[in-house]
Amino acid sequence: MIKQALISVSDKTGVLDFARALSAMGVNILSTGGTAKLLAENGISVTEVADYTGFPEMLDGRVKTLHPKVHGGILARRDFPEHVAALSKHDIPTIDMVVVNLYPFQQTVARAECSLEDAIENIDIGGPAMLRSSAKNHKDVIVICDPSDYSLVLHELNTNNGEATYETKFALAKKVFAHTAQYDGAITNYFTSLGADKQHATRSSYPATLNLHFEKVQEMRYGENPHQSAAFYRESNPQAGALANYAQLQGKELSYNNIADADAAWECVKTFDEAACVIIKHANPCGVAVGITPFEAYSKALQTDPTSAFGGIIAFNREVDGNAAEAVAKQFVEVLIAPSFTEQAKKIFAAKQNVRLLEIPLGDAVNSHDFKRVGGGLLVQSPDAKNVTLAELKVVSKKQPTPQQLQDLMFAWRVAKFVKSNAIVFCANGMTMGVGAGQMSRIDSARIAAIKAQNAGLSLVGTAVASDAFFPFRDGLDVVVEAGATSVIHPGGSMRDQEVIDAADEHGIVMLLTGTRHFRH
């Protein structure tokens, strides 16, 4: 049965109710600084750590709990007679519970105006020491670093004669070690990102050492293939709009490939202002469209490649209503993603329980970095978040684009960014007409896109074409024009740009350069 608890928290969420409940159980509460003041002001009996140790807080609060009477009471093993004798000799009572969360270092350094001095003053010293001491001796000490665990611990204390089960103590200890590791990793990332100048005014996006912290969401039946094991991890606090914030409304457990494809679909559909639908297969868009309603967007997107859409991942950037749900329900779909679903839509999909429905609130989340594992290393880059504006486009052909062509070209360019390289995308009237993806030569991607359109019964006459990178020769351009394209958008930057521009003029088509490449591997 716990007799004494030490509470010292930066995040004071729920701490009053928790401390009040402990006090009602007869637990003596030790505390420091602002936490002690808050408890006392709210009528909760509390002993200041300085009074308990007989040693005052000093150095502007830098030294509060770093004292043998604190750490001895935490670290002593109750089943070791030598430890018990040492406590008795030095008049050190045991501390049976430690409730600590740390100075907000990560939030502090995330501020643009944060100085090195600000960062240093938000490095917690005593807190991690107490947490680690308690977690090390978790057999005898209940340690809490997360306010969300208060209710669990109180429930166990109330049902187990003032004690927590070993299973709970061990789980809380694991959580503490993960928490302190993340905290120290954040400090390391910050310090190793600072420049060598005296004022440390420059800060690199790529620290000398990189510490990553992700929390396991689930283990999966298998990975990309059945012989591979896999798990899904998420950041501690994903940004609004990130896939990791999904809520699954129904359907089987998400697979490795489901999550990878769902992310590709969601990232693409979020880039559109109009109601949009994206259909993904093997991480490539096989149909993308915008419309007045989700139903219209889906109907148009499906036309691009209905064969490949079978068993695909579908994402909307608007609430899915009954009309859209009825249309999608006619198709075999693995995962359906949207900001929300109407009750009618939910009812329709309830009859198809294998369909995984994911709700994700819309947001502008962009990963701070993208990662790619290589043998013995990790490639790290900023995300491809560049969106070209009309003002940045350069018309290099003699023929000027019409407003409709500009609209089609911008749509095609937006889609091409999410197609595996080499990427060629034919578009018209707010929908993809043919998608060529992942070929080693650009000319083959162009041919495949044209074949896809032909197989779907779609005419490419008058279409706009986007290429994720420049045309190295005119042959790729000749193929898309032969298929029916009358306008083309690509980054430019080839040694043979002028040759390709001359070919565009020869064909009498519109050509725009973006100056931005969108390789995707």
UniProtKB/Swiss-Prot annotation:
Annotated keywords: Hydrolase, Multifunctional enzyme, Purine biosynthesis, Transferase
Keyword field contains Transferase: yes
Pfam families: AICARFT_IMPCHas (PF01808), MGS (PF02142)
Catalysed reaction equations from the record: (6R)-10-formyltetrahydrofolate + 5-amino-1-(5-phospho-beta-D-ribosyl)imidazole-4-carboxamide = 5-formamido-1-(5-phospho-D-ribosyl)imidazole-4-carboxamide + (6S)-5,6,7,8-tetrahydrofolate; IMP + H2O = 5-formamido-1-(5-phospho-D-ribosyl)imidazole-4-carboxamide
Record GO biological process: 'de novo' IMP biosynthetic process
Residue ranges occupied by any MGS-like domain in the UniProt entry: 1-145
Any GO MF annotation of the entry: phosphoribosylaminoimidazolecarboxamide formyltransferase activity
Entry-linked SUPFAM superfamilies: Cytidine deaminase-like, Methylglyoxal synthase-like
Pathway: Purine metabolism; IMP biosynthesis via de novo pathway; 5-formamido-1-(5-phospho-D-ribosyl)imidazole-4-carboxamide from 5-amino-1-(5-phospho-D-ribosyl)imidazole-4-carboxamide (10-formyl THF route): step 1/1; Purine metabolism; IMP biosynthesis via de novo pathway; IMP from 5-formamido-1-(5-phospho-D-ribosyl)imidazole-4-carboxamide: step 1/1
InterPro entries the record matches: AICAR_Tfase_dup_dom_sf, Cytidine_deaminase-like, MGS-like_dom, MGS-like_dom_sf, PurH-like
Domain statement: The IMP cyclohydrolase activity resides in the N-terminal region.
Family: Belongs to the PurH family.
HAMAP family membership: PurH
Protein name: Bifunctional purine biosynthesis protein PurH
Species, as recorded: Herminiimonas arsenicoxydans
Gene: purH
